[in-house]
Amino acid sequence: MSPPSANAAAHPQPLTAPQAWAMLLALVSGFALSQAFRTITAIMATGLQAEFGLSAQALGVFAGTFAFAFGTMQLFMGIAIDFWGIRRTLLVAFPMAIAGAALSAVATGYSMLLLGQVLIGVGCAPAFLVCTVFIARYFAPSRFAAVSGAAMGVGGLGMLFTGTPLAWLVEQSSWRWGFGVLAGLAALAWALIFWKVREPQAAHAGTATHATPESLGQTVRGFGALFLLPHTVGILLLALMTYASMLSLRGLWLGPLLIDRHGYTLVASGHVATAMSLVSLFSPAFFGRMDPGPGTRRRWLTGFTVLMAALFAAMGVWQLAWLDVAGPLAVGVLSGYMVLQYADVRSSYPAAMTGRAMSVFTMALFLGVALMQWITGVAASTAKAQGAEPYAVVMFTIAGMLALGAAAFRWLPAPRQQV
């Protein structure tokens, strides 16, 4: 985002702690719905394949469309937050997610499903970005990782819905009811944000320390300046792989893997998805509190990424029922380390670039999800055509992409000085 946000972040009008937490929780309700929307495919996959005859590759495109729309909108949402503020940006964008869910519930073909995913992705695009900007503005810098971890944990409640509850709903009715219920919940979240979130007057562009807000051209050039810094590439290459690995498993492949490999029912696979989501609720807050600081944080990020790659590789090598349950649970526990990436981004750039850096980083996270879900869909379809076990190939693909991300982060230039 543009420099006015950075100035407002440094000198916003104060909120009391109860006010700040109440507003953050309202914003997190939108993030929770975003979490739910991005993890529906694992539970809806069998119903969608049965009704529309989707291949594994088409299923990967369906799941990745949300992430692609979400990711490509991050820069635009960042600019919107600068110029119009957190509240107005989210209130204008989020109704598109409601419309997309409603459209998906009545979809008559694959193209309508994809359009619904685009609308949902665009509508949810500012959901977590507004939370990180709000935390940067109204909480102390020393608490950024811990508060972000808590927000990610609470927002993860959305993934609990897309476990056992959604599996039961889909099994008792259809996947269409799943989209319908999510549309209703999203409308309630929008109403809560409208009611609770009120930004102080000086919290966005035009009322901050700059008398005149930046032009659009200046803002775009400001984003370009990020890529002139050599350490940006390594940060973004790791960002493309980490969250994508967790979401490709939880949001796309977990249900089909358990059903096809081990004969699980839809509700039984939903139980595993719920358990994975449950442990992932607490993991970000734990890792946020354990943040070792700039001196050690990058080594932790590399090490945990390699460990995550090893878990996926193990699920590819040993096709055992207990491992295919324990592995996702372990991934859910370890996924909390990704909150340290936000702290790493915040400490890797000067204050005037922090907002822009967060926008670009979040964009990379979700473009990575779209990329990995598409690549693993292609890998699964190719493996099936060649007579190979598709889920082993999917797990190896994810492991390899994680290893590449860790290598890039480790060997490409690091920030000269972190703050």
Language-model region placement:
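Cytoplasmic helix-loop-helix junction between adjacent transmembrane helices
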Residues: 116-155
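Helix-breaking motifs and short loop linkers at transmembrane-helix boundaries and internal kinks
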Residues: 53, 85, 106-112, 123, ...
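Helix-loop-helix hairpin linking two adjacent transmembrane segments in secondary transporters
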Residues: 150-202
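Helix-to-loop junctions at the C-terminal end of transmembrane segments
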Residues: 73-85, 283-296, 380
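Juxtamembrane intracellular "pre-TM" segments in multi-pass secondary transporters
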Residues: 8-16, 200-236
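Extracytoplasmic gate region of multi-pass secondary transporters
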Residues: 41-42, 229-284, 372-377
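Cytoplasmic membrane-interface "Motif A"-like loop-to-helix N-cap segments
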Residues: 83-94, 292-305
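Conserved MFS/SLC helix-loop-helix module at the cytosolic interface between two early adjacent transmembrane helices
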Residues: 72-111
